[in-house]
């Protein structure tokens, strides 16, 4: 560092020495006049003005010369050999030429790793690198940042003296570089800095980018910064999001796409920014390609940001593109809409027909993605349902046992939701060799997979009487008590309070009933044929892992299960339950219960305790009446 400082001082003093003989006499003449006016005029004279400019502004870099013949030769070179020959020619190289030759070399060899290795051993290349190192303080800013990128792409070793010299020079100049040069470094060099452990340079670069973020005044620079450097600094990304809100009106469709994909990749659910982008997507009739639409659907799905008008537009705009989609794009799109919980029937019917028309191109991974998406949304094709599931079984059954265990469970669970599971598939996942690993694991992911296994076991018990086993062991399906500190939702709390007031005596009903079927009932009551409450504890309860009573149910008596349905349990902007909750309701019915549904949108209309109590009584009467009508 001291050597560099001396070089700069020497350059400054050399220029000052050249100007002093001319300036000094003038200065003496002006001072001899002892006139303030004369002294002022001396400052405006040409010679003293040069000195004032020299002292006021550090002249470190050599002025860039006019475009020379050598510049054209460097630009037009198509082979590394042509560039290396310029070193031994009669051309005079100014301070930038050696760096420009290196930059052009890296461009020509960008996709030729073997030639890069040979070049590193060439004596002319080594001489070129040393020449650049000796002239580094005189290289212009724009050339310097490109030079650093070129040295990274030429894969110089991190211990290389020349590479370290260029990195150090960049660090010296960071404060004086234009913001566009900082952005170029972030765009082209940040990943290399991170990989090659140039952490100090990267940290300083990010610091300057963050300090000067207000200098961003165009959408391209902003989007580039978000995609290339935003993930490296949390505080920088926060500033960039603020800048996005300021410039979002200038964004075109591709820039909006890049911002959304960047947010999705970093799992940054910035609600104000997502709302602003959604507004412009809805209000402006941007022409969007298939790729843009797929990326937008992916980003909104990944961030779970539900915006009705955007979802409607994406579905409507994607529909004409379906004939040109590959099976992979169909699977990706279906998965995105499943995350959004947005079921557009024409779109999903088109997915089904398109996959059936290209069966030979549909791979197992495509089938898995589409099947899981259909199960999440509880989508049953109205046309060609049998053909679709025949294709699914044809692709899935031969390889099901060889798949990753968690994926096996997910796929069979999806088939259970859609009511198209086969006995062989039940046998595959209920085999003791598979469920043992999930039963013993304490990780949340494995526990979730085991819960799906319990649902599959329930499907086999209640909906497939011809299935003879194997089943999960009784000890495995015993319900796990929910934690006492689990926060209750407002609907859950109000429902329990109303039921307690309605039942009065705890013997007449139970709250939060954990069944051996993998589902928890919000409440359970037992009514006789006349609609009067019966004490639950006196009668057998096969749905419990540990029954408490021993008396059979009286003739005409019915068990009633209360199931509340919260807002997240439904498809977006719909009163249709998601597949998981349709399966739960189906299992409870198959277990012999009458179901009283308590959806959030009905409960919100009830204001007084009397209305809530009357609502539940009316629901129970209707359930009993429907059962008698059957």
UniProtKB/Swiss-Prot annotation:
Keyword terms, alphabetized: Mitochondrion, Transit peptide
Top-rank taxon: Eukaryota
SMART domains: RAP
Organism: Mus musculus
Keyword Isomerase: no
Compartment(s): Mitochondrion matrix
Protein name (record): FAST kinase domain-containing protein 4
GO annotations of cellular component type: mitochondrial matrix; mitochondrion
């Amino acid at each position: 560092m001291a050597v560099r400082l001396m070089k700069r001082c020497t350059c400054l003093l050399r220029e000052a020495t050249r100007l002093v003989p001319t300036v000094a006499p003038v200065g003496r003449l002006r001072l001899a006049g002892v006139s303030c006016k004369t002294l002022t005029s001396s400052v405006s004279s040409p010679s003293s003005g040069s000195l004032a400019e020299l002292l006021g502004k550090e002249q470190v870099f050599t002025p860039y010369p006019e475009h020379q013949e050598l510049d054209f030769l460097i630009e037009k070179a198509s082979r590394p050999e042509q560039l290396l020959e310029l070193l031994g020619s009669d051309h005079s190289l100014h301070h930038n030429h050696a760096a420009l030759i290196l930059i052009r070399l890296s461009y020509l060899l960008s996709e030729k790793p073997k030639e890069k290795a040979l070049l590193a051993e060439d004596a002319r290349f080594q001489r070129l690198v040393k020449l650049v190192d000796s002239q580094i303080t005189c290289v212009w800013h724009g050339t310097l940042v490109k030079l650093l990128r070129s040295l990274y792409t030429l894969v110089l070793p991190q211990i290389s003296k020349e590479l370290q010299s260029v990195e150090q020079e960049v660090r010296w100049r960071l404060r004086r570089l234009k913001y566009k040069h900082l952005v170029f470094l972030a765009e082209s060099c940040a990943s290399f800095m991170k990989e090659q452990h140039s952490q100090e340079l990267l940290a300083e670069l990010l610091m300057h980018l963050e300090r000067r973020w207000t200098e961003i005044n165009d959408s391209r620079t902003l989007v580039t910064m978000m995609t290339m450097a935003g993930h490296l600094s949390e505080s920088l990304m926060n500033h960039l999001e603020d800048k996005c809100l300021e410039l979002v009106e200038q964004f075109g469709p591709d820039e909006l796409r890049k911002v959304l994909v960047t947010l999705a990749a970093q799992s940054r659910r910035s609600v104000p920014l997502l709302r602003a982008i959604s507004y412009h997507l809805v209000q402006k009739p941007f022409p969007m390609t298939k790729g843009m639409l797929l990326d937008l659907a992916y980003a909104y799905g990944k961030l779970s940001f539900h915006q009705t008008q955007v979802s409607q537009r994406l579905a409507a705009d994607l529909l004409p593109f379906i004939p040109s989609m590959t099976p992979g794009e169909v699977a990706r799109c279906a998965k995105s809409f499943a995350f959004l919980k947005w079921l557009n029937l024409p779109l999903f019917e088109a997915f089904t027909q398109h996959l059936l028309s290209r069966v030979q191109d549909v791979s197992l991974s495509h089938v898995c993605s589409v099947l899981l998406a259909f199960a999440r949304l509880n989508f049953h094709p109205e046309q060609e349902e049998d053909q679709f599931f025949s294709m699914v079984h044809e692709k899935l059954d031969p390889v099901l046992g060889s798949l990753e265990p968690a994926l096996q469970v997910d796929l069979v669970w999806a088939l259970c939701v859609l009511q198209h599971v086969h006995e062989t598939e039940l046998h595959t996942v209920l085999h003791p060799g598979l469920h043992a690993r999930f039963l013993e694991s304490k990780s949340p992911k494995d526990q979730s997979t085991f819960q799906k296994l319990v649902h599959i076991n329930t499907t086999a018990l209640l909906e497939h009487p011809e299935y003879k086993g194997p089943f999960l062991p009784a000890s495995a399906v015993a319900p796990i008590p929910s934690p006492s500190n689990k926060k209750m939702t407002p609907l859950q709390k109000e429902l329990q309070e109303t039921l307690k007031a309605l039942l009065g005596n705890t013997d007449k009903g139970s709250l939060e009933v954990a069944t051996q079927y993998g589902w928890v009932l919000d409440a359970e009551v037992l009514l006789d044929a006349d609609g009067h409450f019966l004490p639950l504890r006196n009668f057998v309860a096969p749905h419990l892992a540990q029954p408490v009573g021993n008396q059979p149910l009286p003739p005409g008596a019915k068990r009633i299960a209360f199931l509340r349905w919260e807002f997240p349990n439904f498809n977006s902007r719909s009163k249709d339950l998601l597949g998981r909750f349709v399966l739960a309701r189906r299992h409870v019915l198959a277990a012999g219960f009458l179901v009283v549904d308590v959806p959030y949108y009905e409960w919100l209309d009830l204001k007084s305790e009397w209305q809530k109590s009357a609502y539940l009584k009316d629901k129970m009467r209707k359930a009993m009446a429907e059962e008698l009508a059957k």
